[in-house]
């Protein structure tokens, strides 16, 4: 049985992707799953710091630049069943990864002896990020209540749909498609718009890939929720995406603001290990139960593990 791949991303930096990725990984490991975390923030790898680790000589750059097998660059953490691959360290010489390189990485990850492989992406919709999202079993988008975070996530979703279109069309048809969308946006001056309706009604384009995208919907987690309004933000984002993108978003839950998080970051200990009885533990358990077994109502899982 091949490893399942979860990819955690966001349109904006500083919204808690690394915190969420590490917490999901820890929770899965406590549920007796074998988990590998991969730091895919090409310009600012820091997932290792969350676990109090120092930089390793072997990291993801060895895989891409020296063809080192993945099994030779991951290492165990002090948490049972949880392993880690550190990200790029030569950020002064950024690496632009191709679609083919990412596809090979996905194939190699599935062959590893893990139940789950979680990617912690850098901010924004690079081609490598979008290709990983397209290939993933679970596509997890992180937002907080800041308007800039919400806006950039809409941009990320828009870019993801366009990337999906590109991978499912010929170069000529994709060029026509981009021109049609650009003309529509300039005419309406809107930040988001209905891809599917415009392409079908005005340009004659028809696609069935929207239905295929719905088979693995984007999952949304709202981080650092401080109020009921913040908790309800996920439902608002879901509604907007359905209206303008004709895309279903699954709002899997929110993670409440907790001072224990920044305190644990300063001490370089994962919050779910340093403070195991924080309410965050139950929130991440609920999310993981929803993702690993969507037929169950994860809202009933509030036990601290």
What is each model feature region?
Residues 11, 144-145, 170-186, 218-231, ...:
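G-domain G4 guanine-recognition motif of GTPases
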Residues 40-115, 171, 182-186, 211, ...:
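P-loop/Walker-type NTP enzyme "switch/lid" segment
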Residues 165-218:
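Short mixed-charge
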